[in-house]
Amino acid sequence: MARYKFNPENPNRVCKAKGTNFRVHYKNTSETGRAIKGMHLHKARSYLSNVVEHKQCIPFRRHKGGVGRCAQAKNFNTTQGRWPKKSCEFMLQLLKNAESNAELRGLDVDSLVVAHVSVDAAAKMRRRTYRAHGRINPYMSSPCHIELCLEERDRVVPKGDIKTAAKKQSAKKLKKQKMMYRE
């Protein structure tokens, strides 16, 4: 049985999917995983399909060196973003796999949330490129392992009326009120 990094509180309400040695860039995929973590399943799938169609972008926060700016990243309070098509397609495949695992386990698909996404760098694959003066340089690829866990969450019940706290006044205003009260 495959070992996962995620230890759920209730294993009966979790479904998992995992893929190893995917030939897709590690850095792009880790940013994609970070973007969909915490989303509902249907929202994550529509978001990733929008990224493939260039309607929304993936915000780049950690691996952002040399990444260009785009206006769509403003929605995520950052300036840098990209549209990693291949990473999104691999994530969509894993989400589809996890969804079918959830149906098999009898979980409610409408209440599934992406609880855990882990992207790890796999062993690099080596090729070569030929340079001037008879030199040879490495031409490496950066594949990755992806694991994904969906958790069935309860419906959120809205809270009742909350009493609004009295607005805090500054010391200057309080002093002024005391002066007015004395007169």
UniProtKB/Swiss-Prot annotation:
GO biological process, one term: cytoplasmic translation
Pfam families documented for this protein: Ribosomal_L22
Cellular component annotations (GO), alphabetically ordered: cytosolic large ribosomal subunit
CDD domains: Ribosomal_L22
Disordered, as annotated region: 163-183
Compositionally biased tracts (Basic residues): 165-183
Assigned protein family: Belongs to the universal ribosomal protein uL22 family.
PANTHER family xrefs: 60S RIBOSOMAL PROTEIN L17 (PTHR11593:SF10)
This protein's name: Large ribosomal subunit protein uL22
